[in-house]
């Protein structure tokens, strides 16, 4: 049964990921989410069987069904990312010998699906535009704050416990975690760090608490530094410029930090990873 739950969650992630990609692409563009998707090359309205980029990419061998133009692999990132996120969220109990098929666990899992759906949209949007929309950070922050009244980490697993009074640590986590970075923004007048990242950390603090929240920040810096160093080494060895942004390589342009924060939040939550 545990394996079935993980498989269902992963498939659900593939399906929802397609929608989240549309949300990220159309966010702040004035386009309605109700409108049908179109081929970026020929403008042909896509049928229902073309609305899942991963399957379309594999079945059509990377080409549009109508004009045979190449389908950008960027379109499948959201599906793969969401599938991996949802699969890991559903599987988090396995790492601590917790039965997955129980009401409290499943309620928490569904709640985390909602939370990380918002975070994935932020992930994709920041990756493309290098900015975190305030409305998405606010939505995440509100849900994160609400979580401290209904969810807790029991035996290292995020689980539904029913309504309860949160501790002072839980209440202050949403302030404590982003505070140093907000001060850095204030002191540097935005030159060292943007304000979007501290806003995102408010929700992370409420969701994870102080200890796990601080751990997620450390892990995000490690992931970001490792990523940037890897790209630099590959560029140096092969004399190629990877991950270009216009005419600049990613090493010479602003590196979006929200994706690393979100990946670190997932890792910390799923594995209850404490580095301090």
Task: Give the location of each predicted region.
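A membrane-topology feature that recognizes alpha-helical transmembrane segments
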Residues: 1-276
């Amino acid at each position: 049964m545990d394996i079935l739950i993980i498989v269902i969650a992963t498939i659900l992630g593939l399906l929802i990921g397609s929608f989240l990609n549309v949300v990220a692409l159309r966010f702040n563009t004035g386009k309605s989410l109700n409108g049908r998707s179109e081929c970026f090359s020929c403008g042909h309205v896509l049928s229902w069987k073309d609305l899942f980029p991963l399957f379309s990419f594999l079945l059509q061998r990377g080409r549009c069904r109508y004009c045979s133009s190449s389908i950008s692999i960027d379109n499948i990132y959201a599906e793969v990312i969401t599938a991996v996120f949802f699969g890991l969220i559903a599987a988090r109990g396995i790492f601590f010998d917790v039965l997955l098929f129980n009401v409290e666990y499943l309620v928490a899992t569904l709640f985390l699906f909602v939370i990380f759906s918002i975070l994935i949209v932020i992930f994709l949007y920041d990756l493309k535009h290098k900015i975190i929309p305030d409305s998405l950070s606010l939505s995440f922050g509100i849900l994160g704050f609400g979580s401290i009244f209904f969810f807790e980490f029991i035996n290292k697993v995020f689980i539904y416990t029913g309504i309860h009074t949160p501790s002072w640590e839980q209440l202050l986590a949403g302030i404590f975690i982003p505070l140093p970075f907000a001060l850095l923004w204030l002191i540097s007048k935005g030159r060292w760090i943007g304000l979007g990242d501290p806003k995102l950390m408010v929700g992370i603090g409420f969701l994870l608490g102080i200890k796990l929240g601080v751990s997620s920040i450390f892990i995000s810096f490690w992931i970001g530094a490792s990523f940037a160093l890897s790209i630099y080494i590959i560029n140096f060895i092969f004399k190629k410029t990877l991950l270009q942004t216009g005419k600049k390589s990613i090493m010479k342009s602003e590196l979006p930090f929200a994706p690393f924060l979100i990946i670190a939040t997932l890792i910390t939550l799923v594995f209850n990873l404490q580095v301090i």
